[in-house]
Amino acid sequence: MQLQLLKESGQREVFCGLTSIVWLHRRMPDAFFLVVGSRTCAHLIQSAAGVMIFAEPRFGTAILGERDLAGLADANEELDRVVADLLQRRPEIRTLFLVGSCPSEVIKLDLSKAAERLNQQHRGRVQVVNYSGSGIETTFTQGEDQALTALVPLMPQSTTPQLLLVGTLADGVEERFLTLFERLGIGPVASLPPRRSTELPAVGPGTKLLLTQPFLGQTARALQAKGAELISSPYPLGVEGSELWFRAAARAFGISDEHTTSVLEPLVTRGRAALEPHRKALEGKRLFLLPDSQMELALGRFLQRECGMELVEVGTPYLDRALQQEELDLLPADVQLSEGQNVEEQLQRVRQSHPDLVVCGMGLANPLEAEGITTKWSIELVFSPIHGCDQAGDLAELFARPLRRRGALTFA
């Protein structure tokens, strides 16, 4: 099927990859994320995480001052001092992520060499890795992709058959998924990222990859380079996507369709029942998805096929066909897709099309609301447990809620 694809470039309106630290630091409590950046970087992460500094969270910022940016001070020397002080204060840290930012990249601070140097200085005490969270060329979810890619070289090699779930899931969702895989007869099952940064799963020719998020292309390719095999499937958002996701894994491990159906059928029935009250609020409503997270195709598929919404346009920051083809195949043939962003032109199309709901970044939401256009923050979908059949009702409610709010505030 040939879908209409509009490629755009121009001014963008997205968060940077530093935002992903908010969910990654919760996933790996023995890791610390040290951003090498400006005060703006520090304010962004602290505000996004909703954590006060005196609570000693597992992230922080080594702030580049004016002398650093002007090249009048040795930023590497200062970074070494900051890391030494941090490790002395926080002896529980086992993995230290040095996270690049727009300012550190502008002054060409080589954090890969810094990581090598710090590994030598603190050998046996902590593992130091680095990745870029800069938003110069990427969107916010790609921060996780960069972080996981940085861990791949540290993963031991193995030829043992296993399933590897790639991408951060809420703990409760992951537990339910592991239980379902056990009932299906699939195992062992490992996760990347792991709950402890020092307990990285092995990977090799016997490993089959199942992605939980569509924005992990770089990680998937790094794992494939180590011999792993990617299982292609839609993503586990909504009842349909979750069922197809589990069925793809079952087929890859030789599980019969009959057994898979017997395990999944109760969940599918329960998930569809949970969807029904929200479907009534969403059915027939017109939806415009602005590019922000790379989750837009999966969300559009869910909202159109399971909730009855009409897709005006589905935008994505980057269309990775190797990871998104299964989602593309489930979208209507006449849907308008856009890749990349020219924010002024896209906002003009929003105004002209008069959608009932726009899914967009926080920076665009308030201006659109002021124009009378109902919006949903796309970043909330990354922070919320939305994966799996059991969460399908909650996922639909996230979109029904702003429509109900708008209805409650409308006066005759």
UniProtKB/Swiss-Prot annotation:
Binds 1 [4Fe-4S] cluster per heterodimer. The cluster is bound at the heterodimer interface by residues from both subunits. It comes from the Bacteria. GO terms for molecular function: 4 iron, 4 sulfur cluster binding; ATP binding; metal ion binding; oxidoreductase activity, acting on iron-sulfur proteins as donors; oxidoreductase activity, acting on the CH-CH group of donors, iron-sulfur protein as acceptor. It catalyses: chlorophyllide a + oxidized 2[4Fe-4S]-[ferredoxin] + 2 ADP + 2 phosphate = protochlorophyllide a + reduced 2[4Fe-4S]-[ferredoxin] + 2 ATP + 2 H2O. Its EC number is 1.3.7.7. Gene3D superfamilies: Nitrogenase molybdenum iron protein domain. It is an enzyme of class 1 (oxidoreductase). [4Fe-4S] cluster binds at C16, C41, C102. The keyword Transmembrane does not apply. Its cofactor is [4Fe-4S] cluster. Pathway: Porphyrin-containing compound metabolism; chlorophyll biosynthesis (light-independent). Keywords: 4Fe-4S, ATP-binding, Chlorophyll biosynthesis, Iron, Iron-sulfur, Metal-binding, Nucleotide-binding, Oxidoreductase, Photosynthesis. Belongs to the BchN/ChlN family. HAMAP family: ChlN_BchN (MF_00352). Protochlorophyllide reductase is composed of three subunits; ChlL, ChlN and ChlB. Forms a heterotetramer of two ChlB and two ChlN subunits. This is Light-independent protochlorophyllide reductase subunit N. It comes from Synechococcus sp. (strain RCC307). The lineage of its organism: Bacteria, Bacillati, Cyanobacteriota, Cyanophyceae, Synechococcales.
